[in-house]
Amino acid sequence: MTNSIEQAWDLAKQRFAAVGVDVDAALTRLDTLPVSMHCWQGDDVTGFEDPDGVLTGGIQATGNYPGKARNATELRSDLELALALIPGPKRLNLHAIYLESDTPVARNKIEPRHFSHWVAWAKKHQLGLDFNPSCFSHPLSADGFTLSHADPEIRQFWIEHCQASRRISAYFGEQLGTPSVMNIWIPDGMKDTPIDRLAPRQRLLSALDEVISEKLNPAHHIDAVESKLFGIGAESYTVGSNEFYMGYAASRQTALCLDAGHFHPTEVISDKISSAMLYVPRLLLHVSRPVRWDSDHVVLLDDETQAIASEIIRHNLFDRVHIGLDFFDASINRIAAWVIGTRNMKKALLRALLEPTDRLRQLELRGDYTARLALLEEQKSLPWQAIWEGYCQRNDVPVDARWLDAVREYEQQILSQR
């Protein structure tokens, strides 16, 4: 460490020790908490299936910042820079549309070999991989239905796509030695008020059971399901509602995915974590930033991001919660978006680990809510930034906003040529 950072580090450790926090233990724990970065920030959820395809499914990437990745080589290059600017363990989250093939491949025919380059790259960079079937931006999803489709042939196509995706996910886990979390999200819903809300959910229930019927090694693959309140073009009815997937995950013992933008604007997923964990074995979190709707803005170090991290740490959910990011902003430098959002998630985890939780919990149990509030607020002023800077330097990444210099240089030399 540089002298100034080392001095600040030593003083900060003393301050935290005075309130009963072991900084070294906190950092050891932080190094066991990977954040899964989402590949789709790098190309606005375009994928490699059809570079000229239109994004559908009630989601939208807004903006036209230059330098968007156009192929796997460019995307991996962009990711490598982002990874080099973020301290601590990371993973990469892939969608099925990021396959690599010299010839077109039907989505229900995708195989592990179509992702072999991703696996080789992940091994090189010591990353785990997570996966998602892509049930959108496809002719057979154009009417707004996939796994709940009334046409059995179309429904079967999407069942087969999800089944193929599970095998790819298991391949990731087997090859990389860390389980791949595969999340199923579908856009199925209606723009206006439906007459029959039940039948699509019955079809979805049956389809999901068929999707997960093949037994896969849990050391390689973990199933997750994700709800949503609404999407563009599906404002009045979403088949995969929160109640549907909460019931499904609890009854089938899959992981439940909570996306920060998939609920009513007055709801927060930090308040849902402790309840859901009573009924499901695992949670997958999609940390995002909804602005008035599921806008998927870049994650900030705001109150909700901090609350999400605090829930994980306070309840020792390290082995049951998988932390992923889900945002896509095309109005700013896409590499910077990754770096900002992921560093903020890690800052939130660090701050949560530096909280004197046991002391605060004892005050709460004694009913001393005055002291609880006072200490909770005072600990916000403790010098966590000095610990963060030391952690960054230990991991050979820029300590402060100097990481932006590397992004600007790359933008000038590489992105501007695209």
Swiss-Prot record:
Keywords: Cytoplasm, Isomerase, Manganese, Metal-binding, Rhamnose metabolism. SUPFAM superfamilies: Xylose isomerase-like. Its EC number is 5.3.1.14. Its cofactor is Mn(2+). Pfam families: RhaA. Binds 1 Mn(2+) ion per subunit. Pathway: Carbohydrate degradation; L-rhamnose degradation; glycerone phosphate from L-rhamnose: step 1/3. It is found in: Cytoplasm. Mn(2+) binds at H262, D294, D296. It comes from the Bacteria. GO terms for biological process: L-lyxose metabolic process; rhamnose catabolic process. GO terms for cellular component: cytoplasm. Gene3D superfamilies: Divalent-metal-dependent TIM barrel enzymes. GO terms for molecular function: L-rhamnose isomerase activity; manganese ion binding. It catalyses: L-rhamnopyranose = L-rhamnulose. Homotetramer. PANTHER family: L-RHAMNOSE ISOMERASE. Catalyzes the interconversion of L-rhamnose and L-rhamnulose. Belongs to the rhamnose isomerase family. This is L-rhamnose isomerase. It comes from Yersinia pseudotuberculosis serotype O:1b (strain IP 31758). The lineage of its organism: Bacteria, Pseudomonadati, Pseudomonadota, Gammaproteobacteria, Enterobacterales. The gene is rhaA.
